[in-house]
Structure formats: structure tokens, C-alpha cells
Design a protein with these regions (language model features):
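Short, contiguous strand/loop micro-motifs
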Residues: 46-47, 110-112, 147-148, 174-175
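Aromatic/hydrophobic pocket-lining residues that form the small-molecule binding cavity
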Residues: 56, 121, 157
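Mid-domain alpha/beta scaffold segments of enzyme catalytic cores
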Residues: 1-40, 44-58, 62-83
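Hydrophobic, aromatic-enriched interface-forming segments
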Residues: 60, 65-125
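Charged catalytic cores and adjacent phosphate/nucleic-acid-binding surfaces used
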Residues: 1-36, 126-224
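Generic signal for short, ordered secondary-structure residues
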Residues: 42, 107, 169-170
Length: 224
């Protein structure tokens, strides 16, 4: 038979403060079923790509000037086709085992510039909607601060979802390999409370030794 599919994208959004939470968090925003030729969405993604590439190039030049020559095209990516700050640090350490702590701190210092290059949650949701798609909060218990994964508690997820609902989020990813049954149940309850649909995702990005593509679920209320 035929395979049914919809268009999809995952956007790493700019960090922002959420309600009463003390630390800014970056969420991953999923877009499903959109028109991939939509000019607003395409322009937003293209501009973000250009900003990010400029930051990485500036970082490479700064690291090179500090005595450790590197080129961004030479940096192996650990997550599919998405370059991450940790990839640059791993590349520097592999090429220069005796790299100074100052150089490592230099790499880390670019986290702020990279998150500022990202798309805001509000703009991301609006662009996905403009393209006729649905916006979904990916792996809600896992967010990021300065590109370091943060594990959230249920109350924190609840606070953030309240704001996301006001911004027009359509759904949340409730089925995720790392989530416990109780966590999934809590997310499904929140989805029902806010009238959101739920999705399942394996978070597979095409990388070797990173999880697995697809997942089984006995629920039937998912977009995919």
C-alpha cells in the first residue's frame, strides 16, 4: 500500500522566560501539514539559517585566532544535518587534545548569540499557521537553556503550556520514548484541558546510534 505522510519541520526556538519560572527556556516547535512553499515560513527559516551560519563562522574565526584553527565545514554533526555548539567543542577537543580551558569557554560563550539567532516561539507558531500547518510542542519535559538539555517537572510544563496556549499552539507531543507512563498521562490530561491534539514522535534525526526511527503506540488520537 501507499505511505501517507505530511510535511514536517522542527524549529529550535529562542530562549524566553515563561511565567514564574526563574530560568529562560528554549522549546522545540514542530510544524506539521504546512505548505512548504509558503513565502512567510520560507523567509523566516532562511533568515534564521543565515543568522546561525554567520554566528558559527564568527565562532570559527575566534577559535582560530585563539590558536586552534578550525573550519565549520569540517565539524562532524552529531544530530542528523543540524550543527550544534557541542559539535564544535567536540571537534576542537578531538583536533587539539590539549586545548586550553579559555578556548572551551570561548566556544560556550557563543550560546547567547546562537539563541538570539533563533526564531521566537510566537513568530514560529504564526509562520506555521500562515503556511496552513499545525504547531506542536515537541518533547515537553525536555527544554534547553544555553543549549544544555533541561528536564522539567510537571508543574513547569503546565506553566509553559498555559502561555503556549495563548500563543496559539495546536498540539503537544505526548508519546515520546523517554517519557514514563505517568508523564504521558499528565500530558494527555493537559491536552484535554486546553483542547489540543496529541502526537507521537521518536525524535530520530538520522544519526547513527541515536534512538530509532518510528515508535509503536496503542493510542489513536495522533496527527501522525
Amino acid at each position: 500500500g501507499r505511505i501517507r505522510y505530511v510535511t514536517g519541520t522542527e524549529i529550535t526556538c529562542a530562549e524566553q522566560l515563561w511565567g514564574s519560572l526563574p530560568t529562560s527556556q528554549s522549546i522545540h516547535l514542530l510544524g506539521y501539514g504546512f505548505d512548504e512553499t509558503d513565502p512567510v515560513l520560507c523567509a523566516l527559516l532562511s533568515a534564521r539559517k543565515e543568522r546561525t551560519e554567520a554566528v558559527y563562522q564568527e565562532l570559527a574565526e575566534a577559535v582560530t585566532a585563539s590558536g586552534y584553527p578550525i573550519r565549520i565545514p569540517d565539524v562532524p554533526m552529531s544530530c542528523g544535518n543540524v550543527l550544534q555548539l557541542r559539535d564544535v567543542m567536540a571537534h576542537v577537543r578531538a583536533a587539539y587534545p590539549a586545548v586550553s580551558e579559555e578556548a572551551a569557554e570561548l566556544v560556550d560563550s557563543y550560546a547567547k548569540a546562537l539563541t538570539e539567532a533563533n526564531i521566537t516561539v510566537e513568530d514560529g507558531i504564526a509562520a506555521i499557521h500562515h503556511a496552513g500547518g499545525k504547531a506542536v510542542w515537541a518533547h515537553p519535559y525536555n527544554c534547553y537553556h544555553h543549549f544544555q538539555k533541561q528536564s522539567l517537572h510537571a508543574q513547569e510544563v503546565s506553566i509553559m503550556l498555559k502561555e503556549l496556549a495563548l500563543l496559539g499552539i495546536d498540539g503537544i507531543e505526548t508519546e515520546y520514548p523517554a517519557f514514563s507512563d505517568s508523564e504521558k498521562s499528565f500530558l494527555n490530561g493537559l491536552a484535554a484541558e486546553y483542547g489540543l491534539f496529541t502526537t507521537a514522535g521518536s525524535d530520530f534525526h538520522g544519526s547513527e546510534n541515536r534512538d530509532h526511527m518510528g515508535m509503536e503506540t496503542d493510542q489513536n488520537s495522533f496527527l501522525l
